[in-house]
Design a protein with these regions (language model features):
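Glycine-rich phosphate-binding P-loop
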Residues: 1
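Short beta-strand-centered segment that lines the nucleotide-binding/catalytic pocket of NTP-utilizing
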Residues: 6-21, 35-36
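Generic enzyme active-site microenvironment
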Residues: 12-13, 211, 248
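A short beta-strand-to-loop transition that corresponds to the Sensor-1 phosphate-sensing loop
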Residues: 16, 247-252, 278
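Short, glycine/polar-rich helix-capping loops at beta-to-alpha or helix-loop-helix junctions
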Residues: 16-22, 255-266
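P-loop NTPase motor domains
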Residues: 21-30, 36-38, 44-243, 259-261
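A short helix-turn-beta junction within AAA+ P-loop NTPase domains corresponding to the substrate/partner-engaging
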Residues: 28-33, 261-276
Length: 278
């Protein structure tokens, strides 16, 4: 139905994602399979290029927020999902390390520093997780847990995520992350959602839909308030970007398991259509 209406569609499937593959192939879409040791990668560190032309026509040209600051804010959420017990000291060390990592690539809070060629609108090459790992290794103290966690992305089973984004973009995209388990599933699901949301915000005049299966992974007890707030924000404001957000879950108890169901209730309240199957 979305295809007939030429609505760009993104499907995030943390469980049984393979069920979408045949349909995706028949529609000449992009089926992205994430797995330990696999090939597909979304660079967690990438600051993605925005197309603000439609926004400028609608709203005029205003002062832009620092893209680096926004990205670092998102990376704090990513790492909080991997290390739920991260201390305030580790959080501050991570913040400093992230700024230093981007500085090594010439990227600062000045958005102009993102461009390799301003005239052509091309962005600079972005750092990857091993760059952050190397910066943390050089810091004197307080980085042990951060380095141990990052080691798996640099030298371990998730080293496939230590590279530039290599996904073919299309009008119909399926992200299968069913081979990922534990805290890595929640963190990668957040990374995929961030990537999709950035794509969805590129052009407010273009219709699009974000479909998130098993959304409790991001708003339930396995997640945290930071990630859940971002998910809720998407459901609140996606219409302002010409989009729709669709969530699915098999167990409403999981849906309401974080902070007394605050985020699950918020999503339901922002959904015009609710379908309950028994």
């Amino acid at each position: 139905r979305f295809r007939e209406k030429k609505i760009q569609t993104f499907i995030i499937a943390p469980d049984k994602g393979h069920e979408y593959k045949r349909l995706c192939d028949n529609m000449n879409g992009t089926y992205v399979k994430f797995s330990p040791g696999g090939c597909a990668c979304i660079n967690v560190m990438e600051i993605r290029k925005k197309d603000d032309s439609a926004n400028h026509v609608i709203d005029g040209v205003g002062r832009e927020a620092s893209e680096l600051a926004l990205k670092i804010q998102s990376l704090h959420v990513f790492f909080s999902l991997l290390i739920p017990t991260m201390t305030a000291e580790e959080d501050q060390i991570l913040d400093e390390a992230l700024i230093l990592t981007y500085e090594k690539y010439g990227i600062t809070h000045d958005n102009a520093s993102l461009y390799d060629d301003v005239a052509e609108g091309t962005y600079k090459k972005m750092p990857v997780l091993s760059d952050l790992y190397n910066v943390l290794k050089e810091m004197p103290e307080g980085t042990k847990r951060l380095c141990l966690m990052l080691n798996r992305f640099v030298h371990g089973s998730f080293a496939s995520l230590n590279q530039q984004t290599n996904i073919r973009e299309s009008e119909y995209m399926v992200f299968d992350i069913s081979d990922i388990q534990g805290e890595f599933l929640t963190a990668l699901m957040y990374t995929v959602l961030e990537y999709v949301y950035a794509r969805a915000k590129e052009n407010r005049t273009k219709k699009k839909a974000i479909i998130v299966d098993e959304i409790w992974e991001l708003i339930g007890s396995k997640s945290n308030a930071k990630a859940a707030e971002i998910v809720l924000e998407i459901f609140k404001i996606i219409r302002g970007y010409g989009g729709a957000a669709i969530a699915a879950t098999q167990d409403l108890n999981d849906f309401f398991s974080l902070e007394d169901g605050k985020y699950g209730k918020g999503i339901i309240n922002n959904c015009k259509t609710k379908i309950v199957l028994n």
